[in-house]
Amino acid sequence: HAYTSIYLVEKGLAQNVVAMDVAEGPLKSARKNIDSFGLGERIETRLSDGMTALVPGETDAAIIAGMGGLLVIDILRRGMNVWQSGYELILSPQSEIPEVRRFLRENGAKIIDEHMMQEDGKYYNIIKAVSYDEKQSIYNDENTADATEEAGIDTKSSVPVVIGDNYGEKLIEKKSPVLRQYLVERLEKLSGIYCRLSKETGERVVDRMAEVSQESREIETVLELLK
């Protein structure tokens, strides 16, 4: 409904915005809201499947939110020609968050900040990432070291890569109290699941118990890092 676009322009955070949706219905609502604020000259609406309606170089940042992580990844993968070096990505996937972090890491985008919040019993993650260097891996390519330093991007971290993918390197580094709360709740839930599984039998039960134990150990590791 273009609420974010309107907010960005009204607060002076963006000069111009392109608000896009894959369906015409939401775009009609967006246009109505944009017109009611008198921002029709600064906010353009486009029918677009992901980032396909954007021309490379036309924008310098994108916000993708309100959908599952796999769809976010699909949009990013198909729109790689748009998010070139220095492009800013603000992402808020509703699921598959570790997969989104991993995709960014493996496709030349560095997560430079992440926030986690809770509202009405639900947790939300907001990831800020910057792309650069023609999609080369910033973690494995020595040739990107100078470029990342010039961009002010720190690629060094004491957080193991897998842990960072699964739980958020930046959240751990800033010792996020919301992440801690989520993990304590998750650990308690896993304990209950393990207890119930221990009373059942079968090969699948054994495999599931191993998965629960592995996740519990990871969470305990992260909780130690959050102290």
Per-region residue spans from a language model:
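Active-site segment flanking the S-adenosylmethionine/decSAM binding pocket
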Residues: 52-80
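An accessory alpha-helical subdomain
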Residues: 132-227
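S-adenosyl-L-methionine
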Residues: 20-60
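Conserved SAM-binding loop of SAM-dependent methyltransferases across substrates and taxa
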Residues: 1-15
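Short loop/edge segments at beta-strand edges and connector loops
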Residues: 47-49, 93, 113
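Short helix-capping segments at alpha-helix termini
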Residues: 11-13, 35-40, 81-83
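Conserved beta-strand signature within the Rossmann-like core of class I S-adenosyl-L-methionine
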Residues: 83-98
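Active-site capping/gating segments
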Residues: 18, 23, 96-98, 106-136, ...
